[in-house]
Amino acid sequence: MELTEKKKTEGQMIITGLICAVLFGVGWFALPILTEKILLGVVLLLAMGALFLTGSTGRYICKRILLALLTVFIIAAITFFTMNAIPGGPFSKEKAPSAAVQAVLEERFHLNEPVGRQFILYLEGLMQGNFGISTKTGREISTTIFESFGISAKLGGFAALLAILLGVVLGSIAALNRAKVADRVIIFFTTLFVAVPSFIMATLLLLVFCLQLNWFPIFSTDNQSYVLPVIALMLSPMSYITRLTKTSMLDVLGQDYIRTARAKGVKQGLVIFKHGLRNALIPVITYVGPMTAYILTGSMVVESVFTTGGLGTKFVQGITNRDYPMIMGTTIFLATLMVTATLLSDLVYKLVDPRIDFD
């Protein structure tokens, strides 16, 4: 049986190597005659074909990549046609431009084309990393997104890191002190933080710490400007991770192998951290994807409350200014990040627990 599996693995490796060789050959010889888009499609298909033959994990990754691409496409389609269905247009303002200027603007932004043609042109731009041009500023959306994303990435990164660290620590404390004062206090506050939306928490933090206590400036460009937005973003996911860690920890500590380790005289700290906490973190890892989605969507409103100048601020400004390319670009960009984060969290889940079989 083992010999058969070994031969099967060797055969998969040989086929994968051949496909990689073909992939290199296609890329080398087809470059002068194929357009960039066709070459990109061929390379992607061949790479996924090679990955598909590497085993159950490779097939799972291929399926998830295809599903991710389909999801982003559907979101792009819904966003595009929703923007086109809204009454008026990006240039429908109180002081409308003259007919000549209106015609020039419509031609520049392809608004004089049929909706189907506009969608095809928009998809072609997305394939090349081009999100269009802002109807408000005239700048490329991709440039604005990547300039603003640095701020959003810092806020989201700090919020996610603190949420995971504090959530795991508080959840472990609650599990080890079940039904005691520490457990009840932690569960009370985590329930409260889960129930309060991030934008309300952001407003409360602004009122208390900026206007009442004057601990932080309302408008700031230094590191102080990150403190309150990070707290507003991390409280809810931290609370959820705390409750998740507590439940998982209690379940793991009740397993037979934990009781066996304690019976053999293994130190309590070693039992908890080496055997208990490691297995208790598996559900937390699966929550990383949804947590990323929560932080990204929550940052849109939180950033506008604190005027941090991040991607969320640009998104809200796009809505206010009827800047449709900005709205579509930020929506698709954030959707891509969410899909990618969910895929990566599933793969990390597999690495942490090798027993998971994707078949």
Residue ranges of model-derived segments:
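Generic hydrophobic transmembrane alpha-helix motif, especially the helices
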Residues: 22-38, 47, 51, 158, ...
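Short, membrane-interfacial amphipathic segments enriched in basic
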Residues: 44-58, 112, 116, 128-142, ...
